[in-house]
Design a protein with these regions (language model features):
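Sec-dependent N-terminal signal peptides
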Residues: 4-13
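A generic "folded-domain core" signal
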Residues: 20-175
Length: 175
């Protein structure tokens, strides 16, 4: 009986430690993928940092992307959510990616998800149209893209990809 109890305790401890290790490793992943019923692979690039283009500004953005692919083809719009950390207290009116050659890629359906003036942030949900997903991700990875945010008080802030975000995008490209 003692051997059975000891064996049972060892099995439980192995299961608990392996599940903890699995969840710990999953939390470290910068890009998550999942197979969808549509037979496409869904990619989720976890929030990565974008720094203010104006180095003196006390602001940054944490941005994430969620989209689907069929092999090498992007087959869905990208849900592009971001949290802007600044002390403006203003709502986000619009946002767009500025690419080389003065090309502007709008983020549509801007919806406020959360806002806290005391903590200095606002979180929004947006849509990046399917035909621009690959172009924007590549431009962000190559530092050829700026996120421009217009606030309802008329101010505009611009953000560039940090090395952290570039690493996340590169990981998504490799999956």
């Amino acid at each position: 009986m003692k051997k059975l109890v000891l064996l049972f305790a060892m099995i439980i401890s192995v299961l608990v430690s392996s599940s903890c290790a699995t969840s710990y490793a999953r939390d470290k992943e910068k890009v998550l993928t999942a197979y969808m019923e549509s037979k496409y692979l869904k990619y989720y690039i976890r929030p990565g940092r974008m720094d203010a283009e104006n180095k003196g500004a006390d602001a940054h953005v944490m941005i994430d992307f969620s989209y689907q692919m069929n092999k090498r083809a992007y087959v869905s719009d990208a849900y592009t959510n971001f949290t802007c950390y600044n002390r403006l207290g203003a709502f986000i009116e619009s946002a767009e990616f500025l690419l080389p050659n003065d090309e502007k890629v709008p983020l549509t359906e801007v919806s406020t998800l959360d806002r806290d003036v005391k903590q200095g942030y606002i979180r929004v949900s947006t849509i990046l149209a399917n035909q621009y997903v690959e172009k924007v991700l590549k431009a962000l990875h190559e530092s050829n893209c700026v996120l421009s945010i217009t606030f309802d008080d008329g101010s505009i802030q611009s953000f560039v990809a940090s090395d952290d975000l570039k690493t996340r995008i590169l990981e998504a490209f490799s999956k």
